[in-house]
Each structure stands twice: as structure tokens, then as C-alpha cells.
Amino acid sequence: MANIGKITQIIGPVVDVGFEGEYALPQILDALEVTRPDGQKVILECQQHLGEDRVRTIAMDSTDGLTRGMEVKTYGMPISMPVGEDIRGRLYNVVGDAIDGIPSGVAANRMSIHRQAPKFEDLSTNTEVLFTGIKVIDLLEPYVKGGKIGLFGGAGVGKTVLIMELINNIAKAYAGLSVFAGVGERTREGNDLLREMIESNVIRYGDEFKHSMEKGEWDLSKVDATELLKSQATLVFGQMNEPPGARARVALAGLTVAEYFRDGDGQGQGRDILFFIDNIFRFTQAGSEVSALLGRMPSAVGYQPTLATEMGAMQERITSTKRGSITSVQAVYVPADDLTDPAPATTFAHLDATTVLNRKISELGIYPAVDPLDSTSRILSPEILGSEHYDCAQRVKEILQRYKELQDIIAILGMDELSEEDKQAVHRARRVQRFLSQPFHVAEQFTGLKGELVNIKDTIKGFNMIMDGALDHLPEAAFNLVGSIEQAIAKGEKLVADSKK
């Protein structure tokens, strides 16, 4: 039987609810429900017990239309997400309501979004490389299967494009399931992602729907329910226009779905899951927005004092167990390009590999704008990757570091003042830097270049050829936005031939 309380105060997304009699108080993190005058339900989450039989809650939806004195029901349980095979291909919000417009029945099973991290003895410790087909990542900061990967970058340097390309390369090439949590990012990007996934058959709406989509229609009556169950992805969204309560919880909602797929439903073996979060910074930002309203003293740069605790509680759940694995790729917005900001700095500690995107590299027209010297990986070692891969990666880093050191001298005195050896290092480093770029499948419509996936053996061969001086006769432009070294050679020879005409 639900207990009934009444709203006593509303301050933006924070709602105070009074109950009569101390036994009626909901527990911390329990869900409460209030109905707006238009019949829409708003879910609240209990955050604090204030004394005098009052609790302070955060709303998961807009509090417009709520007034003091409105009745609030308690559920006696936290916010939960629907689970089961029929959630494949579906689009949910933070409280587990389908928002894709496709009719659905009531979910038989639901799981609380607040759960304990797996016990230490249940964790898996295997180390396996996850190749992505992106040269700069596979060579210099290889990803770990079942590990945590962070994509760091300021505004507009290409985090979302890179995450979309990773979904394209890994989710398509790999038959497993993907879960995407859109946390406080642009609604347009969520729409683009859904369309991209339908076109590439990661989410299956059926041929009839795809034909109608090609004509510019969006007729959900044509969705094939049996095809939908064969989808390989589930999406959970709480976008920029949502209140902070939803943005602070949607990452946990997506993670709950990923955990369900990883562990199975108790009927046998779990699975290997890909879990994408775009953007983990918004999770922190939402927490800081409500922190002051909840009466907490702000800490460094105005963030909530519980920043490390909240981040740790979530990141510890993203892990691989003996039943299945979660490989997570998290985009991390870096405010004002400052990696020492508490939000990105707290995230760093939890990751196995970091891919740092640099605005200076994007200004050179090199995409993906990955900083090869700032990016790291726990598994960049000869024991795991083999000595050929490791030696090539170290040579690339060495030549780029030398180029970086010489840039000040070049800026002041010019190239002519360098020794012959340094001139040669600079020429090769510039070719290496350009060869780290590559055209993406998801950017074909913008670049006009066909997307490329590059095998790691071809990547190593290409960089070794450049550093050994075998391609010194080709112009630098030949190495920009190409896939394999053969394409660069063909492009270079064409440029040389054209210049002689």
C-alpha cells in the first residue's frame, strides 16, 4: 500500500514532501510519484530526510505545474528499468518509459537503477585487446576488451563523431549487444544516432519501415515487432533539455540495462556488452546543479563535495565479471580544455585507456584530432601487444616528441637553423602526424571521403615505412586522411605526377 504525502515546497527541480507520522517516510533513493493537472506523472527520488516528517526529493521531469499541497505517492522501491529480451532496439528515458513511440506492454521484470558493484571475487582479470580499425587508437593507446575507455576533449573537437565511429566499427563488426546512454547531450545527436543505427541494421525496424524512412516518412505503424527483437542495441536518453535529476540518473539507468545483458537473467551464461556514454561530464554537471539546492557546501570550482563518491559508485559497476564483460567507452567533455578540472581529473583515475582530443590538432585539419603524446593505455606493453607493435608505437611517440621540442626553435629561427638530422626528423614527424588521420564512415557525408577501417598489421607496416625513410620522396599531403599506406603511396604518386604537368 502506497503512503500518501503532500508537497510542502518546490525550488526548481528540488521538491520537499511532508508525511504524517514518522513510519510513513520513504527510504533514501526511493521513488515517489506526483500527478500533474494534465494527467502526466512526475517521478521524484528521495534524497534527504529533513526532520519534522519531511523529505527532500529531486524531480526526474520538469516541475512546471506542480503546486504545494499536491498529493505524492511512495512506491517503496527505487527508480527501476525494464529488463528482458523485448527491450532490444528500444529507446527509454531515465524512469524506464519507452520514448520511441512504439506501443509496448508492461514490462514483466524491472531492475533498480541503484545497485551494488560486483564482489571482488566475481571479477574477471583477463587482458585482451579490442581493435577498433582506427590507426591512432590501435597503435598508440590500444583499448582493453572489458575495460573502461575515456574520450577527453573540449567543445567541438570530435568526441561524439569518434564515439559514433566506434559504435559503427565495433558494434557492427562484433555480434554482441550495445547499450548507449545519452547523458545531457544534444537531442539532434540522439536522433541522428537512432537513424544511423536503423540504417546500419544495429537496430532493426524492418524493411518496410526503412523504405518509408528513405521517402522521408517516420511511420511507426510499419515497425516489424519480430525484427525489432533481433536488434543489437538499446538506447537510454536524458538529453540537454531535461532537468538535472534526469541527467544525474540516466547514466545509471543505461548501466542497469548493460548489467542485465552482461549477467543474463539467471538462466545461464552472460554476454559481452559494449556500453557507450555520451557524455559522462554531464552526469557530474547535473550533480553540481542540484548539490547547492540540497544544501551541500560546494567544493573546488563549485562542484559537489560528493563528486569522487558519485563517480566511484558508478564506475565500479562498469566492470567485467566471470559471467560476461562490459567494455565501456565514455566521452568526457573537458571544460575550457583544462584537463586538471575536477570533473575530468576524477574520471581519469577509473580508466584503462584514455584518448585525448586536442584542439590544436583539429586546427591542423587532422581528424580524429587525437593527441598521440597525451593519450595513454594500460596495455601498451610488449608482453600483451608483441614487440613489433610496441617498438613501432614507441618510435612514433619518440619522433613526435622530438618534433614538439623543435617547434619553438623552428618558430623563432626557422627550419634552416636545424641540423640535417633534425630536419629529417621534422619531415618524417609531419608525415607521421598526418598519417595518424583517417576518413570516418560516419563523416562520409561531410568529407566526401569513403570511411576506412585499417588492420593493425597494415598500420604498423605503414608507420615503419615512413620512419625508415622509404617514403621521404612523397609530399606530406599524400598522408592526410587516408587509410592504408598503399592509398597514401598512390595518392602521393598522383600528386607528384600532377605537379610535373
UniProtKB/Swiss-Prot annotation:
What molecular functions are annotated in GO for this chain? ATP binding; ATP hydrolysis activity; proton-transporting ATP synthase activity, rotational mechanism
User: Could you say which EC number(s) this protein's record lists?
Assistant: 7.1.2.2
The entry's localization annotation reads: Cell inner membrane
The record's section on InterPro entries has: AAA+_ATPase, ATP-synt_VA_C, ATP_synth_F1_bsu, ATPase_a/bsu_AS, ATPase_alpha/beta_chains, ATPase_F1/V1/A1_a/bsu_N, ATPase_F1/V1/A1_a/bsu_N_sf, ATPase_F1/V1/A1_a/bsu_nucl-bd
Similarity section: Belongs to the ATPase alpha/beta chains family.
Describe the function of this protein: Produces ATP from ADP in the presence of a proton gradient across the membrane. The catalytic sites are hosted primarily by the beta subunits.
Where ATP is bound, by residue?
Answer: G153, G154, A155, G156, V157, G158, K159, T160
**Which reaction is recorded as catalysed by this protein?**
ATP + H2O + 4 H(+)(in) = ADP + phosphate + 5 H(+)(out)
What organism is the protein native to? Cytophaga hutchinsonii (strain ATCC 33406 / DSM 1761 / CIP 103989 / NBRC 15051 / NCIMB 9469 / D465)
Q: Which proteins does it associate with, and in what oligomeric form?
A: F-type ATPases have 2 components, CF(1) - the catalytic core - and CF(0) - the membrane proton channel. CF(1) has five subunits: alpha(3), beta(3), gamma(1), delta(1), epsilon(1). CF(0) has three main subunits: a(1), b(2) and c(9-12). The alpha and beta chains form an alternating ring which encloses part of the gamma chain. CF(1) is attached to CF(0) by a central stalk formed by the gamma and epsilon chains, while a peripheral stalk is formed by the delta and b chains.
One Gene Ontology term, aspect cellular component? plasma membrane
The keyword rRNA-binding appears for this protein: no
Instruction: Reply yes or no: does the keyword Nucleotide-binding apply.
Output: yes
Q: Where is it predominantly found?
A: membrane
- Per UniProt, what is the name of the gene that codes for the protein in this document? atpD
Q: How does it sit in the membrane?
A: Peripheral membrane protein
**Primary enzyme class:** translocase
Tell me what this protein is called: ATP synthase subunit beta
Q: Record's Pfam families?
A: ATP-synt_ab, ATP-synt_ab_N, ATP-synt_VA_C
Classification via NCBIfam families: atpD
Keywords in alphabetical order, please. Answer: ATP synthesis, ATP-binding, Cell inner membrane, Cell membrane, CF(1), Hydrogen ion transport, Ion transport, Membrane, Nucleotide-binding, Translocase, Transport
Tell me where on the tree of life, at the top rank, the source sits. Answer: Bacteria
